[in-house]
A protein has these predicted regions:
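Residue-level signal for inorganic ion chemistry
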Residues: 19, 42, 53, 88, ...
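Short loop/turn motifs at secondary-structure junctions and domain boundaries
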Residues: 71-75, 94-95, 116
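Short, well-ordered alpha-helix to beta-strand connector turns
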Residues: 76, 171-172, 192
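Glycine-rich active-site/cofactor-binding loop and its immediate structural neighborhood
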Residues: 81-113
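Acidic beta-strand-loop-alpha-helix segment within the catalytic core
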Residues: 103-185
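Single conserved hydrophobic/aromatic residue that forms the stacking wall/gate
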Residues: 191-198
Length: 198
């Protein structure tokens, strides 16, 4: 799996650099459906990731949020699962809470995960049996059990609606983050405790 994690990181970094070239610049925005925008940055990132991963591993399947699904992937033991720009709304708003998200799934079980935030230069990686890393340094999850000491990564939209107001004093801190994938990376830090996905 060393080659897979290396190539996945390379793809995430290259896609992240592409995304940065669009960030706070001019790009096209389309609506895929209910509150689900897509930009030219999403598509450019998707194309680059696919080019790198499929060229390196042509025998693996491909599933991406921005690519038309092919049922052929179901016959593959290993499948790349990609969101080329998770947190598109945040990207559009200029909020640096978005990531490139790449996973490798084997027979339905995730065995590799890579997240890259190109604005903060945070590169998260995890692979089966090897733990998690942030920018090549080992990281571990918090063992905190006291609610008043926990930092909670919660939904930006739920925060705007006031849904977290009753819990403000329950936790040490509430940190609103829009991207679901981006919430999953920082929980690997010892000082961040729990993502909420709503």
């Amino acid at each position: 799996m060393n080659k897979e994690i290396k190539v996945a990181k390379e793809a995430a970094l290259e896609a992240g650099n592409l995304i940065l070239s669009f960030y706070k610049a001019d790009y096209e925005i389309r609506d895929k459906g209910y509150h689900n925008p897509v930009t030219t940055a999403d598509h450019a990132s998707d194309n680059r990731i696919k080019e790198i991963l499929v060229q390196s591993f042509p025998e693996y399947g491909w599933l991406s949020e921005e690519t038309v699904d092919s049922k052929n992937r179901l016959s593959n033991e290993r499948v790349w699962v990609v969101d080329p720009l998770d947190g598109t709304k945040e990207f559009i708003e200029g909020v640096p809470h978005f990531v490139v998200s790449i996973a490798l799934v084997e027979n339905g079980i995730p065995i590799i995960g890579v997240l890259y935030n190109p604005v903060t230069a945070e590169l998260f990686e995890a692979s089966e049996g090897n733990g998690a890393k942030l920018n090549n340094k080992n990281i571990t999850c918090s063992s905190e059990q006291n609610l008043s000491s926990m930092i909670i990564l919660n939904s930006r939209s739920e925060t705007k609606k006031g849904l977290w107001d009753p819990h403000i004093k329950t936790f040490k801190e509430l940190k609103p983050i829009g991207s679901v994938a981006y919430k999953l990376g920082p929980v690997s830090y010892t000082h961040l405790t729990l993502p909420t996905i709503g």
